[in-house]
Amino acid sequence: MTIVLIGPMGSGKSKLGRRIARRLGKPFIDTDKVVVAGHGSIAGIFAEFGEEHFRALERVAVEDALAHDAVVALGGGAILNAETQDDLASRRVALIMVSAEAVVSRIKGSKRPLLTDGVSTWAEILESRRAIYERLATRTWDTSSRPLDAIANEIADWAQNGN
């Protein structure tokens, strides 16, 4: 069974995903890392080819990742693609959220191309995507103040037992 983590930039999807995968004995796939490994930095892709090109590369990475029995962390904007939304309808999807206050230190100095203005841009992006995240999510966790190990244990239990 594929477990998918979605949520805004800086919410902890990658860190949680690695921990959950270890607990479940599954591979971990971070679709942003897959794109970077094959095509260079996300900032570079945005600068040279634009967001639309990046989203096309991301879609290929998502489609491939979802074909595996793995824990998969999607980039924050991957859910904007209608095919990806359709693909997630039949999967266990964990929405990983974080407050604006908690994300400030996580994104400080970030080279993420959509965060040029920091937390205010982050909050705008989150609000523009929130309804999609919530519609796709099977269950939601907040990483603002709880230890990631505790959250990873809960998600692993949920993945195995459905509760």
Please provide the spans of the model-predicted regions.
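A glycine- and Lys/Arg-enriched "phosphate-lid" helix/loop adjacent to the NTP-binding pocket
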Residues: 90-132
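Short glycine-rich anion-binding loops that position phosphate/pyrophosphate groups of nucleotides
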Residues: 76-79, 99-101, 146
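P-loop (Walker A) phosphate-binding loop of NTP-binding proteins
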Residues: 8
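ATP-dependent small-molecule kinase phosphotransfer cores
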Residues: 29-87
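Hydrophobic anchor at the beta1->P-loop junction of P-loop NTPases
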Residues: 5
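Conserved glycine(s) of the Walker
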Residues: 12
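Short, flexible helix/strand-to-coil boundary loops that buttress conserved ligand/catalytic motifs
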Residues: 39, 58, 66, 107-108, ...
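NTP-dependent small-molecule kinase module
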Residues: 15, 19, 23, 120, ...
